[in-house]
Amino acid sequence: MARDYPLELCRNFGIMAHIDAGKTTTTERILYYTGKSHKIGEVHDGAATMDWMEQEQERGITITSAATTTFWERTEDGKTPLTPKHRFNIIDTPGHVDFTIEVERSLAVLDGAVCLLDANAGVEPQTETVWRQADRYKVPRIVFVNKMDKIGADFFNCVKMIKDRTGATPAPIALPIGAEDKLEGIIDLVTMQEWVYQGEDLGASWIIKDVRDELKAEAEEWRGKLIELAVEQDDEAMEAYLEGNEPDVPTLRKLIRKGCLAMAFVPVTAGSAFKNKGVQPVLNSVIDYLPSPLDVPAYMGFAPGDETETRNIARSADDSQPFAALAFKIMNDPFVGSLTFTRLYSGVLKKGDQMVNSTKGKRERVGRMMMMHAINREEIDEAFAGDIIALAGLKETTTGDTLCDPANQVVLETMTFPEPVIEIAVEPKTKADQEKMGLALARLAAEDPSFRVETDFESGQTIMKGMGELHLDILVDRMKREFKVEANIGAPQVAYRETISREAEIDYTHKKQTGGTGQFARVKLVITPTEPGEGYSFESKIVGGAVPKEYIPGVEKGIKSVMDSGPLAGFPVIDFRVALIDGAFHDVDSSVLAFEIASRAAMREGLKKAGAKLLEPIMKVEVVTPEEYTGGIIGDLTSRRGMVQGQDTRGNANVINAFVPLANMFGYINTLRSMSSGRAVFTMHFDHYDAVPQNISDEIQKKYA
């Protein structure tokens, strides 16, 4: 079967935004106008199509990025198609800060993005975070200033904030006509025409007319700015413009596309998804300005087993190349079981094909292949380069793994996931729950690599670790609902760490004589602190065979065995370097085990000697509040051992930035709500580890002793 859609007619894009910028509503409108969804689901009443997990519908926030395939033809009157039908693969991404890992994963497989802004709030903290992630993955984007019907909506302030907050160059391609309850539609600056929405048909029809006289001067001024930015993309167009010849409409679109793909500027349009105004121009802009898989540079991978990870194997959007794909999301579907959402970068995949998971070196077989629409699925027999599909029945594959042709192997990605900063203990209520809980936690961990499950060796408790309170709340909730596990949940605990504060040298000899062969090993170690975040490293500086080569792995094994449980309170030890500088052995009594025991004892002694200290996770906190609550909020943050970094104004609100220990942030959301009558909001994410003050360190050591 040949491909239905040439690659130039495909768009793989995501919708990225701050929580509450209207992402789910916008996606719903897109699905409605492109004919996939027959009734519009409102987030306010919990009926949105893309938010397909129960908790998302209850909490009104988007948690998982579901992938949807739909179709659109460029149109200006809503009736006449001006381009062939394009295939859109839309990835819905969450906007809450606890879920930035989801956004990271979806950005890794997108070609372009639509960034939503709330017209009143502008560029919010989570928008900045996601914007920086998109910059890192070099994802071209367009901006939709949504909620233009809201009180206080200000399009031009949003444009200014894009420049001030992200450093990008905004290029408005449309201006809103009116705002708040006077919003009528938009002026298309490329064609210099108005789109005026009318009637009650959910925004599916509008009138195109010339720009009214009172708006002409402003529209012409902004069009002039747009043309100046666009002609910079092409020498010929620039020369013609300097000679007084403006580009015609098709040329202007081509130049805007070129600038958008090169990330020289960001096209900006406006509207209100909730009021059904301005969504179709966004769909047209996706066709006009966002990349097809052919516009994206070849994906460079490395050969499996190459420890240097030299990226010298290219895979580009071409059906004739060997098959290579990236698994970017795993979901549990109540009807099909485990679904692996996969982006094909090159080649063709057919039902029944053999493939290799090159990340793990395991074989997989293609069972069922599906194209997804939020919660509906369409079975397919074949997928092509550039497609985003779901595979059922993969046994070994987890998020971030590469799937490829067994004869032409490549590893595309090594996704890095942040360390969890918060943990809770969970205990099943009954024996029957115990088995179910093990299965549930394994499934959830396979879906979400930023979530870890561990067993505490001393207490035997199961520990869930995650990126924030909301993250763990939702996982516990899913465990109860989807897997019907009843469990007792402990209070959240902070993931402390230990490190050292000075260099120390330890000379330790392990000797044991119990009839027959004894044990003997001597090691001399130097332990040195490293910069925060550098982690652990080991080197042997042995010369002249004081410790034979074959015993050195035993030395390192002994060192590593101590790292999981530090001397102060049993937390993992981080950021130090160990050098083996001398030692001694016995021809008969020495062994790898003897050296392991010696280095373990040396390390225990050495960590104390090197001034072990306790570290705690410090969170970057941003609070957005009306002016009148600022003093109280700053006072409260300071009482939580917070260091206020500065204040800023955003619209008519104050923005407070601070670093606060995670240990003092539990339940902060409720305190903030009551202090500000529910008007202040905050976001926080992990920033760095820092030393715990001595008096608190003593308390923690007593607690964990």
Curated annotation (Swiss-Prot):
Keyword Ubl conjugation appears in the UniProt entry: no
Describe the location of the tr-type G domain by residue ranges: 8-294
UniProt lists the gene as fusA
Q: Which GO terms describe its molecular function?
A: GTP binding; GTPase activity; guanosine tetraphosphate binding; translation elongation factor activity
- Quote the InterPro entries the UniProt record gives: EFG_II (IPR041095), EFG_III (IPR009022), EFG_III/V (IPR035647), EFG_IV (IPR047872), EFG_V (IPR035649), EFG_V-like (IPR000640), EFTu-like_2 (IPR004161), G_TR_CS (IPR031157)
Q: Name one GO cellular component term.
A: cytoplasm
The record's annotation in CDD domains points to: EF-G (cd01886), EFG_III (cd16262), EFG_mtEFG1_IV (cd01434), EFG_mtEFG_C (cd03713), EFG_mtEFG_II (cd04088)
Classification via SUPFAM superfamilies? EF-G C-terminal domain-like (SSF54980), P-loop containing nucleoside triphosphate hydrolases (SSF52540), Ribosomal protein S5 domain 2-like (SSF54211), Translation proteins (SSF50447)
What GO biological process term is on the record, naming one? ribosome disassembly
Residues at which GTP binds? 17-24, 92-96, 146-149
Task: Name the family the entry cites.
Answer: Belongs to the TRAFAC class translation factor GTPase superfamily. Classic translation factor GTPase family. EF-G/EF-2 subfamily.
Compartments where located: Cytoplasm
Presence of the UniProt keyword Cell membrane in the record = no
Name under which the protein is recorded: Elongation factor G
Keywords recorded for this protein, A-Z: Cytoplasm, Elongation factor, GTP-binding, Nucleotide-binding, Protein biosynthesis
**Described function:** Catalyzes the GTP-dependent ribosomal translocation step during translation elongation. During this step, the ribosome changes from the pre-translocational (PRE) to the post-translocational (POST) state as the newly formed A-site-bound peptidyl-tRNA and P-site-bound deacylated tRNA move to the P and E sites, respectively. Catalyzes the coordinated movement of the two tRNA molecules, the mRNA and conformational changes in the ribosome.
